[in-house]
């Protein structure tokens, strides 16, 4: 590098950095190219894509890799900022489809649906459920700030936060995997921190102190089980290991 600079060879083409506006416009192409309709759920395809062609598939996932609802909110917000009617229209199709067809009988998100195989995963995860709530509370807060309300979505999120409280264990943890009837499939509490932020957001939005108390319990669990022991080991692929990525939320 020094050799090139000393001879005036540094960046011959005098490249200029792209502006934030330009980059957002380019990246927003994902919201259009990945948009999938024709199923009971409308979504942006973003899970298990083939790198050779990035062709959309029939897998719709709330949270984790798919982040269907968070993608919809990001597109919605950017659509308003940039006056993109196409993005706003697509985002609302996602929200409307999940409001109508995206919840289980109890009220959890249908977090992982594969329309290619006609399969809906009957086992829920605290991480995907939490990240779905997180996304929708961002949407509701944004809408409220701009003078718009969505009573049906507010009721759905209130119900979800209430049923999360039923899942919380005495030590403050949340089971990693569970079914719609609250049967616990995986008792490990490694993904507990993923629930902390949506609980705090729920408290801020709904002014319900129970959610803040629950969030504090998750923080206490995190401190006692993870931080004080300083035993971060293995990887997030290990179900018996704490989810470090999720803990960053807390």
PLM features: what roles do these ranges have?
Residues 69-85, 131-149, 194-209, 249-250:
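Well-ordered alpha-helical scaffold segments within catalytic/enzyme domains
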Residues 86, 120, 148-152, 183, ...:
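A structural signal for alpha-helical segments
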Residues 15-58, 86-109, 153-175, 209-232:
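Long, well-ordered core segments of solenoidal/helical folds
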Residues 51-68, 115-133, 176-194, 231-249:
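Solvent-exposed loop and edge beta-strand segments that line ligand/cofactor-binding
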